[in-house]
Amino acid sequence: MVKLSNLLVATFGVLLVLNGCLARQSLGVPPQLQNECNLDNLDVLQATETIKSEAGQIEYWDHNHPQLRCVGVSVARYVIEQGGLYLPTFFTSPKISYVVQGTGISGRVVPGCAETFMDSQPMQGQQQGQPWQGRQGQQGQPWEGQGQQGQQGRQGQPWEGQGQQGQQGRQGQQGQPWEGQGQQGQQGFRDMHQKVEHVRRGDVFANTPGSAHWIYNSGEQPLVIIALLDIANYQNQLDRNPRVFHLAGNNQQGGFGGSQQQQEQKNLWSGFDAQVIAQALKIDVQLAQQLQNQQDSRGNIVRVKGPFQVVRPPLRQPYESEEWRHPRSPQGNGLEETICSMRSHENIDDPARADVYKPSLGRVTSVNSYTLPILEYVRLSATRGVLQGNAMVLPKYNMNANEILYCTGGQGRIQVVNDNGQNVLDQQVQKGQLVVIPQGFAYVVQSHGNKFEWISFKTNENAMISTLAGRTSLLRALPLEVISNGFQISPEEARKIKFNTLETTLTRAAGRQQQQLIEEIVEA
């Protein structure tokens, strides 16, 4: 009787486990995502879709491709013509971008942060002594939406987070202008907005989920940006489909690739009733309807008519100070950078900032959460590589990240080996092509021709690699006895394998004649 009871309990437990597994399989994991990383063959990927706008175009890679689906990312290339403006958008996934070509001005809107860039020039037609409409608080009235607390700040109390300096600047209510303003500034600001930054070739910049971002091409050539969305990131609470939300403009050709491409995509205002918009923004209904861009067919990249006037600092110096890049104190006090003032970009195309540099071979530069703290929030990082002719990157693998390699110039050969020891990729890669290198897959990169340049995005804020050859390699760390017994070779041969390569990252790729000479020397 006891045995029968135990048998029934065991049977019930097995059925419960099986039921839970089946429920998870049917509800939690869609069929198209099951076994999505069974990659027996890798391909060099090309952009599959192009969406054109008035002043540029966006090219997408199919995020449903097995390789991109495996690593959980979506990739796009933005081409913004001179004078083009990429309208404000935000995503549900973290985004990291690299400027391949050109210069521009970018801005990101972080919810809850103040407008720290202000233009104190008087507006056209503004009369002397007449405040800007909506800024009647200079006489003691609060701004619209402030209430008593904001009104008290006008009586000499500092704003939250200002301190004595800000308080002194606010004592201008008795006739003194705000700190940094003259008589014109006392009349009101022409414009106020959040931080604006210059971007140029070689810049890596990141965007957190939900933070709107815009960019303007201020240069004389097309601004080309390659961007990656980490749709498998924990901050994306939806499915593994890239979702872009537009604050302005309409895209009649579709969304961010994949399943959204067949459906026209409008901005967020289009879904609201015009009367509701008018009440929320305190404007008339006709202007509210204009926000919905119902008849706008320019797309998401529009051409700016006339000069593009935003408050921005002068173009930064070519080299930032080392003190800024490497602060004296290894532990911050929490005041240096907040989410509002945090830098969102870092240039990694400057040879002076290379982590590995050999003039005859090339250079490698990485950016992670230590050099760009915002990457800690998005959990992404990047590596810039340049190989000279007949050079190679020693075989290695990514320990804790997937890698998405994009060729920015030249040609190169890439070989990738999977967990079964099979060569799953051995192809030439050229400008504009993409290669997915899953975590743990070993690979080697060789230049083909004069030069090979690339940018790699990695799905970890502090991605780590392990080399298979060289002075700091896995083989170098093994005892000779392990190598000789593992490969059934003599101790002398094991010594050659372990110590012959002195480089750590880059080396010279031997040509056929050089390789034949080495073999003759070894045989002799």
From Swiss-Prot:
Positions carrying Phosphotyrosine: 78
Compositionally skewed regions (Low complexity) per UniProt: 124-188
Tissue: Accumulates in seeds 8 days after anthesis.
Induction or repression: By abscisic acid (ABA) in an ABI3- and FUS3-dependent manner.
Record-linked PROSITE patterns: 11S_SEED_STORAGE
UniProt-listed Gene3D superfamilies: Jelly Rolls
N-terminal signal peptide: 1-23
Post-translational modification note: Proteolytically processed during seed maturation at a conserved Asn-Gly peptide bond by an asparaginyl endopeptidase to produce two mature polypeptides referred to as alpha and beta subunits that are joined together by a disulfide bond.
Keywords for this protein: Disulfide bond, Phosphoprotein, Seed storage protein, Signal, Storage protein, Vacuole
InterPro entries reported for this sequence: 11S_seedstore_CS, 11S_seedstore_pln, Cupin_1, RmlC-like_jellyroll, RmlC_Cupin_sf, Seed_Storage-Functional
Region (Disordered) residue spans: 119-190
Modified residues (Phosphothreonine): 116, 459, 501
Family: Belongs to the 11S seed storage protein (globulins) family.
Function according to Swiss-Prot or TrEMBL: Seed storage protein.
Protein name: 12S seed storage protein CRC
Classification of source organism: Eukaryota, Viridiplantae, Streptophyta, Embryophyta, Tracheophyta
